[in-house]
Amino acid sequence: MKTVKKAPVANRPNRINDEIRVKEVRLIDQDGEQAGIVSIQQALEMAEQAELDLVEISPNAEPPVCRIMNYGKFLYEKGKAAKEQKKKQKVVQVKEIKFRPGTDEGDYQVKLRSLIRFLEEGDKAKITVRFRGREMAHQDIGLEVLERVKNDLAEISVVESAPGRLEGRQAVMVLAPKKK
């Protein structure tokens, strides 16, 4: 049996070696072949001869299924697979860009490039047009800005929530990236 840096028994998902307390087990050897139902002593001896661990894979089966393997390597591979899975999960964020009804062309283009970058990275984009003072009387200008943004980004995005009404002193639209 190899010496394995052992976590506390309560934290370990599988029982190994002498922790297995049954009379007989269904054994799978290190090559993945069925060795049949054997006594626990015989299974431990086979694991010791192979200089590996006896790991209880399925404790609820009758008799429990045990496998001869390197437990440290098994835990490492399991952890590595979990990390890889976590890495593949993308958390979608909502990025916000604020416009004003009188946003100049140069500023508009800079903000548009930022929106394109956000959408290409897979994030959602929240476009807000804020009105101050007398601008509230010309809400149509702000809605035209949102319409222009929507048209400029139509190829790479889809409108998730359109600016139907004002929320206080601002009009809001949310764009999501198109599925590839």
UniProtKB/Swiss-Prot annotation:
SUPFAM superfamilies: Translation initiation factor IF3, C-terminal domain (SSF55200), Translation initiation factor IF3, N-terminal domain (SSF54364). GO terms for cellular component: cytosol; membrane. One of its GO terms (biological process) is ribosome disassembly. Disulfide bonds: none annotated. Its main location: cytoplasm. It is found in: Cytoplasm. Pfam families: IF3_C (PF00707), IF3_N (PF05198). Keywords: Cytoplasm, Initiation factor, Protein biosynthesis. The keyword Cytoplasm applies. InterPro entries: T_IF-3_C_sf, T_IF-3_N_sf, Translation_initiation_fac3_CS, Translation_initiation_fac_3, Translation_initiation_fac_3_C, Translation_initiation_fac_3_N. One of its GO terms (molecular function) is ribosome binding. Monomer. NCBIfam families: infC. Belongs to the IF-3 family. IF-3 binds to the 30S ribosomal subunit and shifts the equilibrium between 70S ribosomes and their 50S and 30S subunits in favor of the free subunits, thus enhancing the availability of 30S subunits on which protein synthesis initiation begins. HAMAP family: IF_3 (MF_00080). This is Translation initiation factor IF-3. It comes from Pasteurella multocida (strain Pm70).
